[in-house]
Every structure is written in structure tokens, then in C-alpha cells.
Amino acid sequence: MSKFLDMLSGSQCVSLEKCGDVVVSTNDCMIALYCHFCRDLFTQLPEFLRHLQSNHSDVLHFTKEHNVYSVEELLSGEQDKAHEDAQSAGHNSSSGDSRSLMNSEDSRAIDGSEENSDNSPVKPEQIGKQNEINLLAEVTNILLQTNDKEERINDELKPESGEFKGARKKANNESSSLKICDLKSHTIARTSRKRMSLVKNHILRVFDRDLIAKLEMKPLEPDSKLPITEPIQEDNIPGTCFQTPPKPIPSLSQLSVRKSSLTEANHICTKYDTKKTAPTMPKLLNNVPKSILTSQQAQVNSDSSEINETYHISEAASQVTKTTKSFPVQINQIEILQPLKLPKTLITPINEEGVSDQMENSTKNINNAQSLLKENPKKFLKKPSELEIKTKGGPNKFLNVIKSKADPIIVKRVQTTSAKDSTNKIQIRSNDKTKGFASEFNSTKIRKLKMENCVDLKTEDPCDNTNMRLNKMATIGSCEILKAVGLPAITDNAIEAIMLLPDELETMRIRADQFTKIYKKYYSIWNYRKIFPPAKPDFISQKIFALTREVNKTMLCNLANSDIKGIINQISVWHYNIYTQYIELDNISEIARYTLKLFSFLPVSFAYFCKWCDDIFILKKEYLKHLISHQVRFQCTKCIKVFKYKGYYEKHLRNAHP
């Protein structure tokens, strides 16, 4: 290279001048050209040369402008030309090889005719042949042009979709062979059909497998008979008739039987003895037929029997022709006792008015009940000969009352109806002692119920007690927050009537009026669902912040945004319940009516505002799910995001806050 430069510099035609240097940056892997005249850097050689021609031509003394091009520009021009030539050649080849062949034959024929015309004299026969050849050539050209037009029209009308459902078109000329493009289209169609058939078969196989799996997973029908693996024991099979309808459960009036009516058992036993020819039935397991004695039959037969006799039911009594549905009580022995004439004072129905009066009187002195239990705790534990009360869980309750030793009488009473259905209950008392005991027992019982706000005397689990305490603590906390606004009656109407003095009531009313006047200004909060387009959560949070600031300033309290959101949710839920579900307008107290007048501007539809974030919910289910998400263990202090597990929290710290 140095020799070549020396040769150029030695000649008079070429003059070399140093205009710049090559600069290399190793960090960026870049090469640049440094201009000595203006001290600029250029990354490309064509730019550097154009810069020299335009700005430094006076120093370098260019004799003529040199056209400086990059290698890429030169190559791109050559590639475009080559591409255009290839396209033109492709079009010419696709127009049809047959036409070129015919043209070549025509040209040969014409050349031959010309040569013949030049060399030899013209004959009439040759002239006629040449005219026929020319006519044939023109006809073939016309036919080829029409065929080309038809092919173009067919290509334009062909659908672009990949479906090959139509019938294949037959070629007009059987001798004409298929072109390359037609062969390609046929191969594509054939391969696509094969692939689609494979996919179709695969789908059908999957459907068949799913149907077989569903048939295998179906449960057994109830009519299907299972194989019996154990031997059948005929003694254990009950002889009940399943076609007969079930008998209704006897009412209380049918089961309350006097002891004098049991004399009818004598007649029943004699009837069983007379029936010796009756067909025998197999014995039932734990089922003994018993006779149902109504109260009317007991009153008819009570006067005729006065002798104490004891009858034992024999095994023949169980041989009955008709199958009956047995009750859980088994009668093994019947004792016929003397008729009892009880005074009217001992059997009295309990009125609801007396119970309500007793409830009111029992609440006057609650401390007396505790003193009675502390002074003599064994006072309420009487002997079993005087009184015995047994209760069992479930709808059937058996009450056995045994009187004193002077006139021993056994009373068995079956109660089938539940405590909710029975309106009038019968109370059986033997003498004055048991009467006084029952009154004391009921009074202490009612006092305990009133003190604990319970309905049934049941043993409660410690978990239930803790839940009740937590609910009470939550209601107390909400009441304290509502007192700051003057609306404790929303949680409980009895708070203002019982717990507050008249002076405190006046102050509460004044504070409630102030809060309603302030709350009425913020239309976008209490009428969120009717605003269209709906307001954004950021805008609502700003409004709630302004509401809390104004309430704290005017009412001289220290409430947070979460407290204000909780108050708004409680007011909206209370207002919705009054007008829709739980409370009737006719039975509302004066305090509730007063608060309704204050919040008469509120609509029935409302929205739930989350205490811990700016989210707003219309449905209650979504709101409760969202509250559960806040009750988690890990929370980011920077972006206030919540995480259920420690791993998610640590991953968030690594990615979001490195």
C-alpha cells in the first residue's frame, strides 16, 4: 500500500493532502474520522467527504465536484434493477409457453414465405397456402387471447379462503397439460385435506373417550339390584306393608290420657284371646303393637272400672293380622288404678298475658334472684318423690310427675309438638309446696334469661361466648363513634331512651343536626350511585377527607377518615333496612322517626366505602371479600400493598423496592 501511495504522489496527476485521522473508541466499539480543519468527528466516510467538498473546498482546491456515494447506495440501485428485470421475465414466462411457440412457428412460416417470395417467382397455389396459414395464425391468436382473458377473470373470482369444498373444474382441452402453479395448488390442497382428516379423527377419538368416562362415572340407579353377599335371615325382616300411607302423628289431645281410661285394656286382651284362628306373623324387632286410646274413650270407660288389677300382655298379643306403625314407647305392663278426681285449680292453662306480667315483675329486682341462690342453693333440689322433671333434646319430650305419698299416682305425658307450635301449655301441680317451688323456679329462670339476653337455656361452647363478646365489643365501639356525631340510636334505639339523661339527649340532637347539615353538602358521597359518569375513587377520597376536616372543626372532635367511612356505611345500611327489609314503618319508635326526618334526603341505593383504602363497592359480597383481604399479616410500608404470605412480601421488596 505504501508503494502504491508513493507512485500516486510521485505522479503529477494526483496530489495527496492529509485532511483527517481515524479515531477508535474501544469502550463503544466505534470508528470515527477526525477533521483537521474544523475539528469535527464523522462516523461515516461519505459524510466526511461531502463535508470536505462543501466546507473546505477553498483550502483543498477541488477542480471538479466528485460524486461521493456509499457502497450500500450503489448496491441498492443494482439490486432494484435486477429485481425489476426478474419480475418482467416472470410475467413473460407465466403468460404462456404455448403462445411463444406459436409465435415462433408463425414467424418461421412468415420468414419462409418471404424467402420463397424473394428467391422464386410467385405461384397461385403458394399464395393460397400462405393465405390459409395466415388465417390459421390469426385464429389461434384470437383463441389464445380469449383463453387469457378467461383465466384472468377466474383468478380474480377465486375466493381467498383455504376451503376446498367445490368440485374441480375439468380442462377444456384434454391434451393441454397442467401448469406449474396448478400443480402446486393441487399438492397444497391434498396435504391440507390429509391434515384436516387427521385432526378430525383425533377430535372424534377424544369425544368417544369422554363419553366412555362419563358412562363409567355415573352412579348406580336406585332400581338396580345389588348382589346379596350375606345370607337372608327371615326373623330380622319386618312384616310392614309399604303400600299403605303413613299414619299422622297423634296430636296432644289424643295423647293426654287419664289413668281411669286404662281399663279398656281388659276388653282388648279378651279380644286377643278370642282370635285363635288368626294367621301368625313373624315377630318384629323392637316393635310391639300397642293400642291408641283417645281422650273420649277414656271418659266413657272411666266410670265402669274401680278395681286395681294388673295384666301382662302375652306373646299372642303380638300376633296381629294388620301391620301397624309402632311408636318409640313400648308398653310392657298396664296397671289399672282408681280414677282420680283432681280439682280445677290444679290443672290450669298458662296465659300469655300472665307470662308477660311475670316478666315485667321479675326484672324489678334482679339482685333478689342472686341472693336466693346464695342463701339456700339446695332449696331448689327437691326429693324425687315430690317432683321429677326430665327433659330430652328433640321435638318429643317426656314429663314424669310423681305426687306425694298420700295418694301415689303415676302420670306419663307424651308431647309431640314443639315448643314453638304449642300456644297453650298445661301445667300440672300436685300441692302447695310444688306450686311455690315452680313459681320460684320460673321467676329465677326468667330473670337469668333477661339478664343474659338469651332465649333458650342451653350449654354454650366457649367459642360461641367469645364470638358474642367480640360482637358486643364491636357494637360498643361503633356506639362510641356514633356518639361523637350524635347518632347512637342507629345501632340500638333503646340507648337514648334508657342510658341517656334528658340533657344528654338534647346535646345529641344538636350534634346530629350539625352532622346532617354538613353531610348534606357532599352530594357526591351519599348519592354516588346516581352520578353519571361515576366519580373516580381519588375524587371521592378527597371529598371524604374534606368532610372529616369540616366535622372535626365544627363539632370539636377527633375522627379519622376510617371513622367517617364507617359512620357513612352504618347510616346508609340503617336507612336501607328501614325502607326495604327488616323494619316496618308503622312500628318505628319516635327516635327512629326523628333520625329519618334528619336523613330524608338520602336515596335508598348506596355504596360501601372501604376504611383501609379508597375502593368503593356496590355489592355487599364484594365488599366483605375485600375486607377479608385487608386482614392479613404482611403489609408494605412504602406502597401500602398487602400480602398473605411472607415469601410474596419479600419478593415484592426485592422487585419493587430494591
UniProtKB/Swiss-Prot annotation:
Task: List, as start-end ranges, the regions of compositional bias called Polar residues.
Answer: 89-104
Q: Name one GO biological process term.
A: male meiosis chromosome separation
- SMART domains documented for this protein: ZnF_C2H2 (SM00355)
Query: Where located?
Result: Nucleus; Chromosome
**Which stretch is the leader sequence?**
none
GO CC annotations on file: autosome; nucleus
User: Which terms are listed as keywords in the entry?
Assistant: Cell cycle, Chromosome, Chromosome partition, Meiosis, Metal-binding, Nucleus, Repeat, Zinc, Zinc-finger
Which GO terms fall under molecular function for this chain's record?
Answer: zinc ion binding
Region span, Disordered: 80-131
Which pairs are disulfide-linked? Answer: none
Q: Where are the zinc fingers (C2H2-type)?
A: 33-56, 608-630, 634-657
Q: What PROSITE patterns does the database record attribute to this sequence? A: ZINC_FINGER_C2H2_1, ZINC_FINGER_C2H2_2
Q: Which InterPro entries match?
A: Znf_C2H2_type
Q: What is its main location?
A: nucleus
Task: Tell me what the record says results from residue 223 to N.
Answer: In strain: Md199
Note, other: Drosophilid specific gene duplication generates rgr and tef. Teflon has a function unique to Drosophilids.
Family, similarity comment: Belongs to the Teflon family.
Q: What does this protein do?
A: Specifically required in males for proper segregation of autosomal bivalents at meiosis I. Expression is required in the male germ line prior to spermatocyte stage S4. May have a role as a bridging molecule maintaining adhesion to hold autosome bivalents together via heterochromatic connections.
Recorded protein name is Protein teflon
Give the organism, scientific name: Drosophila simulans
The UniProt gene name for this protein comes to tef
